[in-house]
Every structure is written in C-alpha cells, then in structure tokens.
From Swiss-Prot:
Similarity field: Belongs to the bacterial ribosomal protein bL35 family.
Pfam families: Ribosomal_L35p
Record protein name field: Large ribosomal subunit protein bL35
SUPFAM superfamilies per the UniProt record, alphabetical: L35p-like
InterPro entries the record matches: Ribosomal_bL35 (IPR001706), Ribosomal_bL35-like (IPR021137), Ribosomal_bL35_CS (IPR018265), Ribosomal_bL35_sf (IPR037229)
Region (Disordered): 1-21
GO cellular component, one term: cytosolic large ribosomal subunit
Disulfide bonding pattern of the chain: none
Any one GO MF annotation of this record: structural constituent of ribosome
Gene3D superfamilies given in the database record: 4.10.410.60
Keywords: Ribonucleoprotein, Ribosomal protein
GO BP, sorted A to Z: translation
Gene symbol of the encoding locus: rpmI
The keyword Transcription regulation is assigned to this record: no
Classification lineage: Bacteria, Pseudomonadati, Pseudomonadota, Betaproteobacteria, Nitrosomonadales
C-alpha cells in the first residue's frame, strides 16, 4: 500500500500537541486591522485548541503528525 499523503494546507495551519489536542491560530488577524479595536486585536493573539468535534478530521488530514 502506498504512503498516505499529508494535506499540506493542514500541516501549515495546525500543530498536534503531545496530549492529542490540535493547536491553531486565530483568524481575522491578517489585514484590515485599522477598523478593529485594540481590544479585539489583543484578544486574537496567541493560539487556541481546535474544537474536540473537529479534531478527528484534522488528524485524518495529517496521518503522520
């Protein structure tokens, strides 16, 4: 059986942590930031976990992660 391929877009967006949770970055932080308040931009900093109902589909896109 051939090797399974990793979806490269998912590999760029997600990181699998040691406990099995998946880390992702926040959206709405790339451009058009002048109309967004300082508070909203500050709250979009950092990373968050992918919701547990979506973890299985993300892990399926990255079989070797």
């Amino acid at each position: 059986m051939p090797k399974m391929k990793t979806k490269s877009g998912a590999a760029k967006r997600f990181t699998v942590r040691a406990g099995g949770t998946v880390k992702r970055s926040q959206a709405f932080k790339r451009h058009i930031l002048t109309k967004k308040t300082t508070k909203s931009k500050r709250q979009l900093r950092g990373s968050v976990n992918v919701h547990f109902s979506d973890v299985a589909s993300v892990r399926a896109m990255m079989p070797y992660a």
